[in-house]
Amino acid sequence: MNFATKVSLLLLAIAVIVIVEGGEGDSWFEEHEESDTERDFPLSKEYESCVRPRKCKPPLKCNKAQICVDPNKGW
């Protein structure tokens, strides 16, 4: 076998390994992917979403994004 043949076979073997491992990696990611509900944790009950005219607990106010925020802190 000459050098070019050895290099070609080595690259082919690497490509096969990458393809096989890549498929397993995708399935692992899909199994362990977080859903939207798992990622969106509320800060606390005081800072929950508010749909107007629902009122927030004092001193919090409902902002444009419909979230109860402290007007003194701005968040």
From Swiss-Prot:
Which Gene Ontology cellular component annotation is one that this UniProt entry carries? extracellular region
Task: Provide this UniProt record's keywords sorted from A to Z.
Answer: Calcium channel impairing toxin, Disulfide bond, Ion channel impairing toxin, Ryanodine-sensitive calcium-release channel impairing toxin, Secreted, Signal, Toxin
| Intrachain S-S bonds | C50-C62, C56-C68
* Coiled-coil regions listed in the entry: none
Primary location recorded for the protein, binned into one broad class: secreted
Which superkingdom is the protein from?
Eukaryota
GO molecular function terms attached to this record: calcium channel regulator activity; toxin activity
Tissue localization of expression is: Expressed by the venom gland.
- Which residues of the precursor form the propeptide? 26-39
- Subcellular compartments: Secreted
**What more does the record tell us?**
May reach its physiological target by traversing membranes, which may be by slow permeation. Alternatively, scorpion venoms are known to contain amphipathic helical peptides that form pores in the cell membrane, and it is possible that these pores would allow Phi-liotoxin-Lw1a to enter the cell.
Provide the domain comment: Structure of this peptide is made of two-stranded beta-sheets (or DDH for disulfide-directed beta-hairpin) that is uncommon for a scorpion-venom peptide, since it does not contain the CSalpha/beta, CSalpha/alpha, or knottin motif common to other disulfide-rich scorpion toxins. This structure may be the evolutionary precursor to the knottin motif.
Q: What is this protein's function per UniProt?
A: Affects the activity of both ryanodine-sensitive calcium-release channels RyR1 and RyR2 with high potency. At lower concentrations the toxin increases full openings of the RyRs, and at higher concentrations it inhibits full openings and induce openings to subconductance levels and reduces the number of full conductance openings. The different actions may be attributed to the toxins binding at different sites on the RyRs, with binding at a high-affinity site mediating the increase in full openings and the induction of subconductance states evoked upon binding to a lower-affinity site.
What is the name of this protein? Answer: Phi-liotoxin-Lw1a
